[in-house]
Amino acid sequence: MKFSLLSAIAAAVFVPFTSATPLASTTDLSYDTHYDDPSLALSGVTCSDGDNGMITKGYNTAGEIPNYPHVGGAFTVETWNSPNCGKCYKVTYNAKTIFLTAIDHSNSGFNIAKKSMDVLTNGRAEELGRIKVTYEEVASSLCGLK
């Protein structure tokens, strides 16, 4: 009886803390220089219009997004008007962190502006090409979005 009661108390105290803590996951990250262009028309990306689109949220070019150049494609954006359009991700590589706004689809991991990858890699985006990062979805306010 004592063992069951202690187990129940431990579970009641421990579980809420562990389930409330977001866990970071690992994925690939690469760059595409077309995201470096602040005049990139959002009408040409997966997250263009529709209820979840960036244009609907008031942004017409990549440069208008508050945390530009930290924008790019995300594997979580599967199709046009995805509910993951405009999501903010905390992306970390070797103790460097950026907050990335998902505006497009990526077949694998994240595909972001070279300038943004240079921030993560201390200017080594071109040399490294593709890296492993940890990421987690965070509040959109961390990307400067409403």
Curated annotation (Swiss-Prot):
GO terms for cellular component: extracellular region. The keyword Signal applies. Gene3D superfamilies: RlpA-like domain (2.40.40.10). It comes from Coccidioides immitis (strain RS). Belongs to the cerato-platanin family. Its main location: secreted. The gene is CSA. This is Heat-stable 19 kDa antigen. Keywords: Glycoprotein, Secreted, Signal. It is found in: Secreted.
